[in-house]
Each structure stands twice: as structure tokens, then as C-alpha cells.
């Protein structure tokens, strides 16, 4: 394990243009090194801050930060916008849209923007009201890499140069637990390539900042331990986004370590030295260009005089109100108390209503936190480890292929599963190598779920993010294409919300998928955890209280939102956001174990409702697969698709043919699928017709000299006009037979070209 320290300094590479750059090396030991380089002064010179970030040589993006000169009026929040622009030229492709240009951001770009926003937003000084926009443009991307984590660092670096008041740079790193023959216990690898990700069983994206000046060591990440350097930089973890890989179950069966809570905690620790290195590089660049913080007018949410008056007026009433267990009753009482405070104090503080309301929220927050820290009770009367009452109803929607209702307290999620052919996979046109997705998870959060009105329509960024988290939690247990050749669309409807609808979606989805007959590798459940910290007692000792199954108010008033999903044996997905300057390792480990205990309790109740896949619904398509020789694929399809279209029309089945000769046949009725299978086999593996064979055929064409009869798919024979009338002479074929007629015929002759001559079979 290397303990060498990097001497990170910015270099003036073009004195005439004023171009500076700084480079940080990410040392992964046996897995090689990666280079992260920041450059400023060449591109986007009119932006307040602009940085070009490189991962090695071929992955390159431009991050710009710009701020309005005047604060935005009439708002009580910080107007930060983060946008990621994916350019198709970055991978040498022309967009596939009609106009051949990029349109609105895709899912990958939206998720990358959220990854940037979550750790960057808390670094801005409180009370800033100027509009700030961070735009990351992907200019070049190596197919072996991802750009999202590089974008976190680039966005932070450009913000450091913008003159905006921030607390310091943010570093982001992707960690993969790679398991191979040389590392059977796994090694955490920073900025892994896609090839290394294929060998991984778990991945983490960790973002954080250094809370005091340190000289970080160059990390090497050996083993599953801390894996990077011997010195411990004081890094505050601000965000974690993590998930198991889609083949983790098979890898564990082969002997790989399971990604348990302990392993996940080790991965977070292993990321810290790399974060410190990236923060040091950003600081070096900002120091070199002499980036000075400009003066901005700040708008604190309330004045101290207002807060003191609100506290004196409302504290006692809020102690009683925040002990009301029912959310609607509590919200109504809280709103009434706030309005009473406004009416009482507005004459004393004219034109400061917004401050009174903000101070009221702060007093409410203090009451909730004090009750948890000192009394050990939460808003609804639970202790720190109790889960709210659970309710489960399976097969709620009559014509859905699978459905389930999952309730946890006042949070209510409806999960609905739809199955279809593999050709219904979602087609992906993005910068990555993925071209399709078989398991699709959509999450909807209508305004009525919180008793409000609002816009409905296309999904917001939050809905896309929550759907992606639930999808990540379930992907590791979705059966393979070979075991279950279906496209699966899972929809989570948040019908009522009071805390962690995303983890409720994971539970509802497991139940719904089982109800649809999907043979999951293991059931998955999720739980949202919270954290409240403060000083208690006369000595002012720091106290950390981890909360299981947090309410919406506990999320808003607490210090951490920590969502964990998994099977009984390992973690499948994790998401962490914290407002603290770091969480002690033992507190994080305790939170993970507390989450596991809750998850096992929920899984047990889910198992009582449904413990294995149900039979598939009669309304769902039943898919069978057969294999045909590759040289027969063209014959099954026919000229311009004639043969396969004919089979589809005659049987009502949907047919998909893969390049390797695998044929998927889908039909709501089993008889249709069997009939289609017989017709395909008759073409691909036919019995060669011979003289004397009899068939009940269908007339497919009439001519002046006879009628063509279909014997097998793709094999027709001719009844000459002289053989149609028996002993009678007929003038027109159409006088005897028409297209579509069924005729019993016998093969009279097959010439050397394979053409078949038929005769009618006499009735006797």
C-alpha cells in the first residue's frame, strides 16, 4: 500500500492566453492509475467560472458557472439550476431524432445533474438569492468511461472560480468492488472502466468535501478495507449513491463476497482519500488563478428579533402540536398556529411576514429535534427503531398482469407490473454503450399524494430520480432473458406520501412482480433512515440518534436522509444525503445495521402476504422460445416478411427472431402460441413432402391454368385445371375453387426442381 503524497500544483501552460491546468493521479494499485485534469482559461471565457475537466485523455467535458448580477425578488429559496448537455458528437454519432439534433435531456443527463446538485447545493452560503446556473457539456467521451462523476468535480471546480460564496470544493468518485481471480475478496477501484465494472459486484458514487486543510495521501485501495493511503483526511461525506450489479447473485454463488452493510461502509471509507485529492487539486487551481469571492447581498430567512418573539409566542403550543400522531390533524393545527403567530406579531414586525413564517418553521424544527434527543420520542410517538404499521394488498387491479398496494403509515404506494415481448424493450439513444433496457421502472408522484394541487404531465427530475433508485434496487434480482424472456415495466404510483415513497416503491414492486409471476432471484425491501444530532446534558455532549422509517417532517428537520434497499443477505441499493460536516464511521455503521434489522422485519411481513411467484395472469402474454438453424431465418421471414406476417395473421401470435436463431413467440392464448410454433417448425425443420402424402391445404392463389394450395408454410403445390373438375371439363378455375377454400389434396408428382403437382382426394 503506497503512502506517497502527491505534490499537486497548478501549472501555467499557456502564458499568453492565461491557461492554467492541474492534474491529480488516482492510483488503484494492481488496477492501474487514472488521471483527472482540470484546465481553465481557454474555453468559455465570459462565464463567471469555466473549467474543462479530463478523465485520462479522451473523456472531456466543459463546466461553466454563471450568476445573475442582482438577487431574484419574491423568493425564499436559493435558485440554483444544474443542467447536463450530452452532445452526440462526443462519441462520433449523429442524433437519431427527426431533426438530427439533440433534444431535451435524457435520463442519464438528468440523473447526472442530480448527482451534481445534491452535494454542490449545500456548499453555497445561506441566504443567497442570485440565480446561479451550472451547465456541464460533454464534449468527448471514451466508450470505456462514464462522465457523471467527472462532472461532479468539473462543476465544483468551475464554481470555485466563479467568485460565488461557497464553503469549498466538492470531490466525487465512483468506487467499484472488483472481484477476480487475483482479488477473490475484492478490491475497491476508483473511476473504474466499464470492463472493470463488468467484474464488480457493487458500485458507489461518493461525494464530499474536506472540512479542514489536509495533505491527502495518494490512495491505492487494496482489499476491501479503507484502501487508500495511511493518513486519514478529514473528509465530510455529503452524498452516496450505490447499487449492486445485475449479476451479483450469480457472483456470490460462485464465491464472491456478498455486498453486506459492512462492505458498503468500507467502500465509503475507501473513497475519502480520493475525494481529498480531488478537492486539493481544485483548491490548487483556484489559488493559481487568484479566484476571489465577490460580495453578494444575503437574505437571512429571519432576524434574531423575529425569532425571539416567535419562540416566546409559539413554543408551548408547538410542543403539544408536534405530539399529534395523525399527519393531517397535525398539519392543520400547525398551519393554524402559524397563522395565529403571523396575526399576533405582524403589527410588531410590519412587512416581515415571511420572516415570521420562517422563524416559526425553525422553532418547530427545534421542538422536534429536542423531543428526539432528550425525550426519546418522535412526532408520532414512536421510539427511534419502530416501523410504522404496515399494510399489504396483492392483486388489486383486475386487468393488470400484477399489482400490489403497500402501506407504511400514511405512505401508500401502488405497484403495477406489465409484461410483454422482448421487442418492447426500451430503446436507448445515449452516450453509453447500452442500446436497450429490459426492466423499466417508472415512478409517479401526483400532487394529491400530499393533499395539494399542482402540474401533472411529463415526469419531473425528482420522479425520474426516485424511479431510477427503485429500479437500481430491483435490477440485481430480475431474472435473466433466458430464464424469463419478457420485457417488464414496473410502475410505482405514490398515492399518499409521508416519508420515503421511493423505498415504499421497492416493497410494492417486489409484491407486484411476484403477483405477475416474475421469478425474482430474491425478494427486496427498502427502508428510509434519518439522523438527528445535537448536544445534550450540562456537559454539552454530542449525541447521535438514528431514526428508522422517517416521516416527511423528520426528513426535513433531520440531518440525514439515508435509504437502504436489499435482500435478506445483501444490499442492492443505497442513497445518502446529509447536512452534516461528516458522519462518524461508527454512527454510519450503526445506521446500516439498524436499517438491516428493519428491512428483515419488512421482508418477513411481505413473505406472509406472498412468498413466491404466482401463476401468470391469463391476460398476460405467454412467451415460448424455440431455436431454428440460422440459415433458415430468411426462409421463416420470407420475402419482404411475407411468411412471418402470414403466420402472425393466421395465429394471432407475436413473433420475434433473434440473430442467433432464437425465436420468441408471444400470445395471450396458449393455443395461438402452439399453432405458431408448429408453423415455424414446419418451415425451419420441415418434413420433406413426398409423393403420396396427403394434406388439408388452403387455396392461396388461382390462375388460368390451376390453383395453388398451401401445404406447409412456405411450401405450395399446384392443382392443374384438368384435375379440378374430375371427369368434367371446366373453363374457369374460379368456377370450382376460390382463394381461402380448404381442399384435401394428395401429392401426385415432384419434379426435379422441387415443384409439387397435386390432385384432389376423392371423397370415397
UniProtKB/Swiss-Prot annotation:
Catalyzed chemical reaction(s): RNA(n+1) + phosphate = RNA(n) + a ribonucleoside 5'-diphosphate
Alphabetized InterPro entries for the sequence: ExoRNase_PH_dom1, ExoRNase_PH_dom2_sf, GPSI/PNP, KH_dom, KH_dom_type_1, KH_dom_type_1_sf, NA-bd_OB-fold, PNPase
Pfam families (UniProt xref): KH_1, PNPase, RNase_PH, S1
Cofactor requirement: Mg(2+)
Domain named KH: residues: 621-680
Cell compartments where the protein resides: Cytoplasm
Keyword annotations of the record: Cytoplasm, Magnesium, Metal-binding, Nucleotidyltransferase, RNA-binding, Transferase
E.C. numbers: 2.7.7.8
Chain sites annotated for binding Mg(2+): 555, 561
Gene Ontology CC terms: cytosol
Residues annotated as domain S1 motif: 692-761
Example GO BP: RNA processing
Gene Ontology molecular function, alphabetical: 3'-5'-RNA exonuclease activity; magnesium ion binding; polyribonucleotide nucleotidyltransferase activity; RNA binding
PANTHER family referenced in this protein's UniProt entry, alphabetically: POLYRIBONUCLEOTIDE NUCLEOTIDYLTRANSFERASE, POLYRIBONUCLEOTIDE NUCLEOTIDYLTRANSFERASE 1, MITOCHONDRIAL
Name under which the protein is recorded: Polyribonucleotide nucleotidyltransferase
Source species: Corynebacterium jeikeium (strain K411)
Amino acid at each position: 500500500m503506497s503512502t506517497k503524497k502527491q505534490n499537486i500544483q497548478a501549472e501555467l501552460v499557456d502564458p499568453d492566453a492565461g491557461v492554467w491546468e492541474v492534474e491529480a493521479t488516482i492510483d488503484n494499485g494492481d488496477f492501474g492509475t487514472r488521471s483527472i485534469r482540470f484546465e481553465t482559461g481557454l474555453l468559455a471565457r465570459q462565464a463567471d467560472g469555466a473549467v474543462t475537466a479530463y478523465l485520462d485523455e479522451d473523456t472531456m467535458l466543459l463546466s461553466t458557472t454563471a450568476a445573475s448580477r442582482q438577487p431574484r425578488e419574491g423568493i425564499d429559496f436559493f435558485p440554483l439550476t444544474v443542467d447536463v448537455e450530452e452532445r452526440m458528437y462526443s462519441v462520433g454519432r449523429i442524433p437519431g431524432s427527426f431533426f438530427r439534433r439533440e433534444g431535451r435531456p435524457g435520463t442519464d443527463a438528468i440523473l447526472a445533474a442530480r448527482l451534481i446538485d445534491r452535494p454542490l447545493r449545500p456548499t453555497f452560503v445561506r441566504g443567497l438569492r442570485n440565480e446561479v446556473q451550472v451547465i456541464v457539456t460533454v464534449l468527448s467521451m471514451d466508450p470505456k468511461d462514464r462522465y457523471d462523476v467527472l462532472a461532479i468535480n468539473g462543476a465544483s471546480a468551475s464554481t470555485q472560480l466563479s467568485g460565488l460564496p461557497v464553503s469549498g470544493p466538492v470531490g466525487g468518485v465512483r468506487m467499484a468492488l472488483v472481484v477476480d481471480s487475483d482479488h477473490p475478496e475484492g478490491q475497491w477501484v476508483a473511476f473504474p472502466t466499464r470492463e472493470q465494472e463488468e467484474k464488480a459486484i457493487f458500485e458507489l458514487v461518493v461525494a464530499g468535501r474536506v472540512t479542514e486543510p489536509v495533505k491527502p495521501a495518494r490512495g491505492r485501495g487494496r482489499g476491501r478495507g479503507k484502501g487508500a493511503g495511511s493518513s486519514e483526511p478529514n473528509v465530510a461525506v455529503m452524498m452516496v449513491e450505490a447499487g449492486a450489479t445485475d449479476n451479483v447473485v450469480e457472483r456470490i454463488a460462485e464465491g464472491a463476497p456478498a455486498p453486506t452493510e459492512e462492505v458498503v461502509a468500507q467502500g465509503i471509507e475507501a473513497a475519502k482519500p480520493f475525494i481529498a485529492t480531488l478537492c486539493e487539486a481544485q483548491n490548487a487551481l483556484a489559488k493559481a488563478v487568484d479566484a476571489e469571492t465577490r460580495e453578494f447581498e444575503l437574505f437571512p430567512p429571519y432576524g434574531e428579533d423575529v425569532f425571539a418573539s416567535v419562540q416566546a409566542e409559539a413554543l408551548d403550543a408547538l410542543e403539544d402540536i408536534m405530539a399529534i400522531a395523525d399527519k393531517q390533524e397535525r398539519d392543520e393545527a400547525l398551519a393554524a398556529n402559524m397563522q395565529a403567530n403571523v396575526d399576533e406579531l405582524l403589527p410588531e414586525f410590519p412587512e416581515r411576514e415571511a420572516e415570521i413564517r420562517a422563524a416559526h418553521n425553525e422553532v418547530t424544527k427545534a421542538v422536534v429535534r429536542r423531543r428526539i434527543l432528550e425525550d426519546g420520542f418522535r412526532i408520532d410517538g414512536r421510539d427511534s427503531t419502530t416501523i410504522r404499521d404496515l399494510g399489504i394488498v396483492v392483486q388489486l387491479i383486475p386487468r393488470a398482469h400484477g399489482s400490489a398496494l403497500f402501506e407504511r403509515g400514511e405512505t401508500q404506494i401502488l405497484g403495477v407490473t406489465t409484461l410483454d415481448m422482448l421487442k418492447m424493450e426500451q430503446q436507448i439513444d445515449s452516450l453509453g454503450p447500452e442500446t436497450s433496457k429490459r426492466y423499466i421502472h417508472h415512478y409517479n408522484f401526483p400532487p394529491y399524494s400530499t393533499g395539494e394541487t399542482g402540474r401533472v404531465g411529463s415526469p419531473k427530475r425528482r420522479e425520474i430520480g426516485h424511479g431510477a433508485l427503485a429500479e437500481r434496487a430491483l435490477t440485481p434480482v430480475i431474472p435473466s432473458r433466458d430464464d424469463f424472456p419478457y420485457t417488464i415495466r414496473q410502475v410505482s404510483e405514490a398515492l399518499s406520501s409521508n416519508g420515503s415513497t421511493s423505498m415504499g416503491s421497492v416493497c410494492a414492486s417486489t409484491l407486484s412482480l411476484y403477483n405477475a409471476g416474475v421469478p425474482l432471484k430474491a425478494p427486496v425491501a427498502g427502508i428510509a433512515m434519518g439522523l438527528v444530532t445535537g448536544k445534550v446534558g450540562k456537559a454539552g455532549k454530542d449525541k447521535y440518534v438514528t431514526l428508522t422509517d422517517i416521516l416527511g417532517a423528520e426528513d426535513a428537520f433531520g440531518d440525514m436522509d439515508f435509504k437502504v434497499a436489499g435482500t435478506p443477505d445483501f444490499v442492492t441499493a443505497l442513497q445518502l444525503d446529509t447536512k452534516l460536516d461528516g458522519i462518524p464511521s461508527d454512527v454510519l455503521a450503526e445506521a446500516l445495521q439498524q436499517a438491516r434489522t428493519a428491512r428483515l422485519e419488512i421482508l418477513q411481513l411481505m413473505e406472509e402476504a406472498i412468498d413466491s411467484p404466482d401463476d401468470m395472469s391469463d391476460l398476460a402474454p405467454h412467451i415460448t422460445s424455440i431455436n431454428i438453424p440460422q440459415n433458415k431465418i430468411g426462409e421463416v421471414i420470407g420475402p419482404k416478411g411475407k411468411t412471418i406476417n402470414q403466420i402472425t395473421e393466421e395465429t394471432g401470435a407475436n413473433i420475434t427472431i433473434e440473430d442467433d436463431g432464437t425465436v420468441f413467440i408471444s400470445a395471450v392464448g396458449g393455443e395461438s402460441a402452439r399453432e405458431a410454433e408448429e408453423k415455424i417448425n414446419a418451415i425451419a425443420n420441415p418434413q420433406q413432402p413426398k409423393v403420396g402424402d396427403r394434406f388439408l391445404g388452403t387455396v392461396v392463389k388461382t390462375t388460368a391454368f390451376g390453383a395453388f394450395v398451401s401445404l406447409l408454410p412456405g411450401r405450395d403445390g399446384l392443382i392443374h385445371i384438368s384435375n379440378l373438375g374430375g371427369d368434367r371439363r371446366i373453363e374457369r378455375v374460379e368456377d370450382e375453387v376460390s382463394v381461402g377454400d380448404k381442399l384435401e389434396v394428395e401429392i401426385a408428382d415432384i419434379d426435379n426442381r422441387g415443384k409439387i403437382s397435386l390432385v384432389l382426394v376423392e371423397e370415397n
